[in-house]
């Protein structure tokens, strides 16, 4: 599979990710990495990166890793733990790790960190294969 082409396709087709500012910077088999430049609009009332922003990054990162196997997927389940507030953060990075690749279900752990490598959130996400080639 041409992972660079897949990365470009995912960035082009994911309109919500584009709106949210999430860029997929790397995809390889069972792995993806995304980045986000934090804007004031992404902060909650206490000045921390909004949890929905962290969740969006985790879902896009996990989903991008899941499609690395060549089939379309949809999110089946997600669980996230917010570990630290993202205060005075300029950039976020999320990385996925494949936990299970089954015939129908794929499971990933995603870590979201700030530019100082501080771990802000950890998510476990399951994706259902739609058994449709990309």
Q: Where does each model-flagged region fall?
A:
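Terminal targeting signals and extreme-terminal segments of soluble enzymes
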Residues: 1-134
């Amino acid at each position: 599979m041409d992972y660079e082409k897949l990365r470009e396709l995912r960035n082009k087709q994911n309109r919500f990710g584009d709106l949210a500012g999430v860029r997929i910077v790397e995809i390889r088999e069972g792995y993806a990495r995304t980045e986000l430049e934090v804007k004031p609009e992404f902060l909650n009332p206490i000045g921390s990166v909004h949890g929905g922003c962290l969740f969006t990054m985790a879902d896009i990162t996990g989903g991008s890793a899941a499609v690395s196997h060549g089939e379309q997927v949809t999110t089946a389940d997600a669980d996230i733990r917010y570990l630290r507030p993202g205060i005075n953060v300029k950039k976020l990075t999320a990385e996925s790790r494949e936990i299970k690749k089954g015939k129908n279900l794929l499971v990933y752990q995603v870590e979201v960190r700030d530019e100082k490598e501080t771990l802000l959130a950890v998510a476990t996400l399951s994706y259902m294969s739609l058994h449709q080639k990309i």
